[in-house]
Structure formats: structure tokens, C-alpha cells
Amino acid sequence: HRSIRRQRQMCIRDSLGRPNNSDPNFSLIKIADAMSELLDNEKVMFIDAIHGSKVEEAIKNQKSKIFLLENLRFDEGEINNSLDFAANVTKPFQTYIFDAFGAAHREHASVVSFGNYLNSYQGPLVSEELKELNKILDTNKSGYSVLLGGAKISDKLSLIENLLPKVEKLMIGGGMCFTFLKALGYEIGNSIFEESFVAKAKFLMDSKYGDKIVLPTDFGVTESIESNIRSNIKVEDFQENHIGVDIGNETLSEFSRILNASKYIFWNGPMGIFEIDEYSTGTREITKVISMSQAYSSVGGGDSVSAINKFSDRKKFNHISTGGGASLEFLEGKKLPGVNIYKPLII
């Protein structure tokens, strides 16, 4: 917002979804008014084009101070990282600020090639995200706890491998815990798990860092997710027809004890099917525990953010990442195409 005030004109470029050609359902026109409200009702003019004469004429005629242009992914040159596309899009402009951290893991034209044609900077959001994520990677001391949830170990295996040596405790809930329990020989009924990752889960638990992993000891279960009927059982009491849908009270108590004793918490992923009230207790209570903790709290992942929006207040958390897949890949130790390729913008 401060940089907008200093510019004669600014064009905002963005992408949305995975549209098939110019699918109107993915047009950015619907966000122009909302963007104007966020900018203290300063007029945001929408241009239904990505590049070309329509864009150049609007800028030349100075019809507005702020422009929002159409979805970049309406042109396959964006996803294919076409240099011709990048050259055409950037033609009317002098300066480029890349501030879409959520796309930094994609080798798209707007991420890696627009900057070749303009005086380019890394935006403040990207810089802030990197600062916060580096805190997670650089934290290698007592009192550092990680809480992971969600459905699949395959989505977070590299994350576990990279963070496990650094943490004091790594708690695992959600559907992904059942792959670990399967590896330990437990009956898990009809709960979701990934057969191809059972051996890897066993390897992690048998490693020299395996004693840092904390798994649930009790669960909320159902025989049919659609029934919204929940029973609470110990892990050793799983029956063949049970489906695990939430962590149980004993696990909630142990996870809460660890979190309350922590100095730094990184949370990614819900503890169960929190969208259904009967299965939401674990996620709801964990959200409250972290929000009230004295620890520095960092949260990543869309479902975790949805849980915060549903059960708590975003202001009670020190950092909520906008990155999604970009955050996970960075924390896995991967080099992201859009990170540190431009000099940081100083506002």
C-alpha cells in the first residue's frame, strides 16, 4: 500500500486456479472491488486482458492509478514459462515487484522470467515469509515442537525428514498417523493410510531420531463418516470396521502438555475431519492451546489456517504463512525457483 502511494501507476498481476483457456469462472474481475476496499476505496480498474494494446492504451491514457489485469493463467505462456510471453507482458512497464510467495515454488513466467525484462525486486511479503520460515529451519534447540496433521504422509515425508533432527518433539495426528501405526503393527480398521509408505514410516521411527516422534494413543472413531456418530477408543481397541476421524482426549492432553512446555511451535495440518462438528474436537482444542501458548507460533497449510479462522483468532498466532506448497517445499530444504532471485524491496 505504501509503495502504491509513491507510484504514478501500478498494475497488479495475479493468477487464479487452473483454468482451461479463458474460463470466466477464474476471471479476476470479481476481486477488483474487494481490492479497492482494502486500499481505502482507491479505485482499482480491471482490464480484461493480459497484454497487448488494451493494456498499453489504458496505461497511456492514465485512466486509473491502479490496474488489475486478467488472470495470467488464461495464457499458456505463463505456466510454460514462455520468454515471448514474459516479454509481451512486461513491455509497458519499468519495474517489477514479485510478492507472490504462494507461487514461488512454480517455475512460471511471472515467477522467474518477468524480472529479466524489468528493474525487479523481491516484495516485502516474500521477504517476511523467508524470514519466518528460516526461523523454523534455524531453530535447533530445546523447546522446539512440530505438530503435523493432514491425510497423507507422502505430502510431508520430506518435511519430517528435514525437521526431525532439529526438533525436540514431532507430534503426528490426522490421517497420516495411521501409516505410522500400521508400521508398528496396530490394527487401524478402515482408517486411511498409505501402504507404500509403511516401510518408510518404520524406518523413521527406528532411526536415531525416532524417539522424538509422538503418535496418538487414543482416537475418535466411526463406522461411517457420513453418520456423524463418534465413539472414543484406545489405539489398542481398534476394530476392523472403525475409521479414525480425530485424536482422542488422552492424546489431546499429551499434545497439549508438549505444546505448553514449548518455546517454539510449528503447526501444519488438522488432527481430524474438523469440518464435521462431531470429529472436530482435537483440531478445535489444539487450535486453542496454540493460540494461548506463550511459545512463538508459526502456522502453515490451508487446512490449519481454515481451522484458525473457524475456531480462533489469527491475531493470536505469531505467523501464519501464505505459502501452502511453497512453504512446505522450502521447509523440505528445496530451492524454490522464485526465492532470492531478486533484490529485496526496501519500503
Describe the residue ranges of each PLM region.
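Divalent-metal (often Zn2+) His-rich catalytic cores of metallo-beta-lactamase-fold enzymes
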Residues: 16-17, 153
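Short histidine/acidic/glycine/proline-rich micro-motifs that form metal-
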Residues: 17-20, 73-75, 272-273
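Conserved catalytic alpha/beta core of Sir2/sirtuin-type deacylases, generalized to analogous enzyme cores
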Residues: 78, 82-347
